[in-house]
Amino acid sequence: MTRTVAAPPVCVLGLGLIGGSIMRAAAAAGREVFGYNRSVEGAHGARSDGFDAITDLNQTLTRAAATEALIVLAVPMPALPGMLAHIRKSAPGCPLTDVTSVKCAVLDEVTAAGLQARYVGGHPMTGTAHSGWTAGHGGLFNRAPWVVSVDDHVDPTVWSMVMTLALDCGAMVVPAKSDEHDAAAAAVSHLPHLLAEALAVTAAEVPLAFALAAGSFRDATRVAATAPDLVRAMCEANTGQLAPAADRIIDLLSRARDSLQSHGSIADLADAGHAARTRYDSFPRSDIVTVVIGADKWREQLAAAGRAGGVITSALPSLDSPQ
């Protein structure tokens, strides 16, 4: 027999671009939402816009524990250990998720804090080059992929809660193992930051380049406008996957350079790149509808469906007696 998991209050820790957008989107969906922000400016901005936000972390976590809220960690990676220590002390029984762009490193920190049993990793694959409360908006996640981890430890009830939050925010849920997420994020999220930085630096060294720069340069360097400390936090936390991805790019560029110098041609790279982009444009996305959360091998089924392009756009049912 299946059931629908109740949607608990949402406690957002960190009200920047992503956390602030979650607060807005979840509230718009009718969820009870409250949050914490370290800076007075961010918390005041949220309150001025009609949201429930304070700068007292202990008070926020006490409320989360009392209401059994789903805690959303929306702070930079370097701040995680300290934040997890506070959660372990004040709200250890609360379900827990995050929005960090790496998953294995976060899982390691959560495990070290003794909070693994109630944790399900998350990563909304969206954003802008801006940060802070004022950068967020309630529509940020509309039709965006939102990874929800299906690692072996995840509790089905907590997983359902995180899935429901993502859906309430307007996202499409992509189930994935943490290590597979990190490999993919290195290629499609973190490596583009390195390339954008390198391209911006290269152009800055060429006289007249900025005067001639137009759409292709603007699009290719958009994420270079991101605050350097945020870029470092996401990229350096995924070193194990980003370094080999960078090696692959360097190899491709080196081969193209050698071919250009020797034969006056970049045909191999241009053809391969065009073919890969065409595959991306036609990549199939199908709705995942047959998996029951908590049923036998449900995690493996969701991971396989995610690899194949499957997404969840409507809440999946859960067993009465999760496994």
Swiss-Prot record:
Q: What is its EC number?
A: 1.3.1.12
What does UniProt note on temperature dependence for this protein? Optimum temperature is 37 degrees Celsius. Is not stable even stored at -80 degrees Celsius. About 50% of the activity is lost when stored at 4 degrees Celsius for 24 hours.
| Keyword annotations of the record | Amino-acid biosynthesis, Aromatic amino acid biosynthesis, NAD, Oxidoreductase, Tyrosine biosynthesis
Enumerate the PROSITE patterns for this protein: PDH_ADH
The domain of life is: Bacteria
Q: Which family does it belong to?
A: Belongs to the prephenate/arogenate dehydrogenase family.
GO biological process terms, alphabetically, are: tyrosine biosynthetic process
InterPro entries on file: 6-PGluconate_DH-like_C_sf, NAD(P)-bd_dom_sf, PDH_C, PDH_N, Preph/Arog_dehydrog, Prephen_DH
Give any Pfam family that matches. Answer: PDH_N
Q: State what this protein does.
A: Catalyzes the NAD(+)-dependent conversion of prephenate to p-hydroxyphenylpyruvate, with the elimination of carbon dioxide. Is a key regulatory enzyme in tyrosine biosynthesis. Displays no chorismate mutase (CM) activity, in contrast to TyrA from E.coli and some other bacteria, that are bifunctional and possess a CM domain.
Supply the name of the protein: Prephenate dehydrogenase
What Gene3D superfamilies does UniProt report for this protein, alphabetically? 6-phosphogluconate dehydrogenase C-terminal like domain, NAD(P)-binding Rossmann-like Domain
Q: Which reaction does it catalyse?
A: prephenate + NAD(+) = 3-(4-hydroxyphenyl)pyruvate + CO2 + NADH
**What is its pathway?**
Amino-acid biosynthesis; L-tyrosine biosynthesis; (4-hydroxyphenyl)pyruvate from prephenate (NAD(+) route): step 1/1
How is the protein's activity regulated, according to its record? Is inhibited by NaCl; more than half of the enzyme activity is abolished in the presence of 10 uM of NaCl.
The UniProt pH dependence field says:
Optimum pH is 7.9.
Q: Which GO terms describe its molecular function?
A: NAD+ binding; prephenate dehydrogenase (NAD+) activity; prephenate dehydrogenase (NADP+) activity
Please report the stretch or stretches of sequence annotated as the Prephenate/arogenate dehydrogenase domain. Answer: 8-291
